[in-house]
């Protein structure tokens, strides 16, 4: 950087402000641009594809800039890449400043605090999370700075913490010093989530944390809140970070509340991923997920509400019934549903609009969008005047039309406000008498100046004479050079151009003062009036937020009803029993992506007498689709949705566990078998009698003997110890004997039609078992050459069924190094069931490092 003594006053000001925000890119307001200097300029130029220039003389400073009116898009790009940006504004009008313009940082934008709608996912959340460990307990708090949502919870172990974080997918984590230095934790966060990590100071003790929260929200707001020590420390971190970065009152931020845990089903990361609840496939696309099927919402609030319901299904039969009754009323009320959808189409994101008001960044267009959204509430209330379901009646009671605010904004704002609030044209004529007078004076003044041009042409005889204006010289009279001899004596020369001269007269200057003075006062008055309007909105933010939440619930209910009608779903019976009975159940996603009418439905029956199904059958026959569809139907029932079945009776499930093949490549550097065993270990550790367990091909990642042994032992443990309802799809035909040994086990298989060599998978699950794999048939479906298929048949016929071998030459026994032997011995003795995922992962990393070292030794010895 330049030497201090060589800096101009403005650059010295820049240096002083930048020193307070060393970890941020500083957007430094200069007129109509945000400028960046030195290292910030080099980073911004590279990341934003800007032209890098220089400022200054001998020790020039690299610089680049972006127009202030387009800054949001550039800001979003930087924050999206993980940078923090400090916004430094001019705090006074440069024309009125005495000396250097006063500048201050008005907010710091980070990945977890960005509020611009264009930079955020519509219908999604952008969470800032704080993690604290206190007395062996994990405290977790999270807030959406754009909507005001603020929640906390505690986690008994790191595994549960990671599961919560995968559900929330925060954009930014706040970690206190010791955790910010915890490389293992940071590695976990990087593997499982996408958020950036920010070190932040934690309160000295839980009492100080609670006091800071009460100082901000008030004692009454937290009077009934039970705030565990670790969670309180995390919540206080969130608040202190927002206060430090946003530089405002955070009026829209709700008092922290405990996240519902006992009344909601907890879904771990494996289940969410394996059932493809919100994303699908290796590319993690929304299309093909359950949310893709269910989300017919029309508002951002509705989309967020539906996503929350899907993330946390209910475990209370009464609450489920309330949602079902509301959905049923909307299913039956076609006209009501359609007319409500029409009203909701024009509703903008009220939660984020409220947030922008709180941050002081809402302009005329945002307030007009707020007014337009609230204006539909009376019509919605009228449509819902006769609803009878309890939940819809609650929604209606919570909808506040805010007539007073809608009327005020309608009278005050023009229909199409300009983007800027500092250039006038935002206040409607008739709202304020002084505005009307100034606007008339400015308009008449401009008319007088326009008429002056005709008068001067007449007086001077110069037909090409014209009156113009620019910001530097103001109004002027321009005369071309050939006509200069005709210029009157009262013309005062102002500027000389190549082909013309510019003049002023006393009359023109007087009119200019009148016009510009009126315009300047008008712009200032409109700005002040607009600030007053924003304050009025600020005063009713809680009412707006309550209405936004109610609209979100209504929209989500309508979405579920729309899907139920469009896809022929039925209302399930949900109770506290243990029965899962599904008649003609269908997979909600697969039935939509395939050809219409081709999906084969299946029945399911589980109860306390027969609670484990062993399902055998060939690959590609439909086993995996069947077991997943049962899990999805149960989940849909417990969010209060109708389900894809002819009839369904669901005994409440406290958790759904899955081990299916979709996760085989999810952990870089880990084998299929290790991933599989970790997921199975988690299931055996956490499942209860009320759980639903979905297992697909357990044990396939190791030898046949080991895999079969593990699969059998796992099934016995679920049957004898846990007692959970379980669907187990397997290629181990030997497991069917368990039905004769364990009273709760039943065998099912996929029906197959054989006609000579032609085989058809009927995709129907029927009682019984099969000992055929139809592997060669599947190979034909996959496109293997006929020559290969024929050779496979010959080999199969020559070998005993259970001892197929194709190797004809003895294999030389490999020679192991001492280090490799050590790894094998440690692996053989490792207690996988007692290890947490983090401990297992760390152990694998250590073994991998040892093997790399041994490999290097072998290579050097051969070299």
Curated annotation (Swiss-Prot):
Keywords: ATP-binding, DNA damage, DNA repair, DNA-binding, Nucleotide-binding. The keyword Metal-binding does not apply. GO terms for cellular component: cytosol. CDD domains: ABC_MutS1. GO terms for biological process: mismatch repair. It holds the Pfam family MutS_III. One of its GO terms (molecular function) is ATP-dependent DNA damage sensor activity. ATP binds at residues 617-624. InterPro entries: DNA_mismatch_repair_MutS (IPR005748), DNA_mismatch_repair_MutS-lik_N (IPR007695), DNA_mismatch_repair_MutS/MSH (IPR017261), DNA_mismatch_repair_MutS_C (IPR000432), DNA_mismatch_repair_MutS_clamp (IPR007861), DNA_mismatch_repair_MutS_core (IPR007696), DNA_mismatch_repair_MutS_N (IPR016151), DNA_mismatch_repair_MutS_sf (IPR036187). This protein is involved in the repair of mismatches in DNA. It is possible that it carries out the mismatch recognition step. This protein has a weak ATPase activity. NCBIfam families: mutS1, PRK05399.1. This is DNA mismatch repair protein MutS. It comes from Moorella thermoacetica (strain ATCC 39073 / JCM 9320).
